[in-house]
Every structure is written in C-alpha cells, then in structure tokens.
C-alpha cells in the first residue's frame, strides 16, 4: 500500500533584512545599479558572475602562495562577488521577475559552492592550515544547514 505525504505548509516569501551600519547605503546603491543595468543582463547572469568571482577568489588565494598580488586579486574578486550576489535578487525584484523558491534554492546552492572555492583556496594558500580550512568549511556547512532548513 503506497501513501503519499502532502505538505500543509505554505511557502512564504522571506523578508530581506539588512542590519549593518552601511545597510541604507547598500540598499540605495543596489537600487541605483538595478535601475541602470542593461535589460540583456538578468539575475541568472549576476548569480553566475558571483559564483565565478568566488572561484577566482579561491584561485587567487592559491596564487597568493607564490605572489602577494594574489591577495589583492582576492579583494577584487570578493567585490565582484558582492556585486553579483547582492544585485541578482535586487534586479529580479525591481523588474518583477521574482522566482521565490527557485531563487532561494539557487542562491544558497551557489553560496555553498562559492564558499567551498574560497575556503579551499585559503587551505592551499599557505596562510591557513588545510585542516583549519576543512574545519571552517564543515562548520559553515553545518550552520548553513541549520539556518536554511
């Protein structure tokens, strides 16, 4: 006898709460950027940019093992990640192209891969012991599972 479970829970939109000192400035900046972003660029493009920037940040940490310019490259990559990761949801809301479940899922999956690239790069950089990086990554994943679920 086969039974199917049905969920009685409704998916509700999450309210984005910015609480940092720079939150008002960040919100105004993101809205300004979203209003001026070319129509050909959508939220998926910005999400991909954010992931690529995190991968490059990880590679830049590896490069820092051989050259101090790698650390400067990490900073640039993290700024590009902020641009893509913060602006993807903003542009979707401004253009009324929200996909709450899909967007929530993709955002968090991309964040998981991004942090793996970043912390992996730290672990091979020589600036952090690989076991410390592994512990940091495991802790991040456990805390993320607690928060997202």
Task: Annotate each predicted stretch with a short phrase.
Residues 1-37, 108-149:
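A feature for the membrane-embedded catalytic helix bundles of lipid/isoprenoid biosynthetic enzymes
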Residues 56-66, 85-87, 120-124, 142, ...:
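Structural signature of transmembrane alpha-helix termini at the membrane-water interface
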Residues 60-62, 68, 103-106, 125, ...:
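A generic membrane alpha-helix/interface feature
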Residues 1-79:
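Topogenic membrane-insertion module of multi-pass membrane proteins
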Residues 68-75, 101, 130-134:
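The feature captures the transmembrane alpha-helix scaffold of multi-pass secondary transporters
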Residues 76-120, 146:
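Acidic (Asp/Glu-rich) catalytic motifs at the cytosolic membrane interface
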């Amino acid at each position: 006898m086969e039974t199917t479970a049905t969920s009685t829970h409704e998916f509700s939109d999450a309210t984005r709460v910015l609480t940092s000192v720079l939150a008002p400035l960040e919100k105004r900046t993101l809205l300004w950027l979203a209003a001026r972003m070319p129509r050909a660029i959508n939220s998926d493009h910005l999400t991909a940019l954010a992931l690529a920037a995190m991968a490059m940040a990880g590679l830049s940490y590896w490069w820092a093992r051989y050259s101090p310019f790698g650390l400067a490259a990490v900073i640039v990559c993290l700024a590009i990640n902020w641009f893509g990761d913060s602006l993807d949801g903003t542009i979707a809301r401004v253009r009324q192209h929200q996909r709450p479940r899909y967007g929530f899922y993709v955002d968090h999956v991309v964040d998981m891969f991004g942090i793996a690239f970043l912390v992996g790069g730290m672990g091979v950089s020589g600036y952090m012991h690989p076991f410390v990086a592994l512990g940091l990554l495991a802790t991040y994943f456990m805390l993320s599972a607690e928060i997202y679920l």
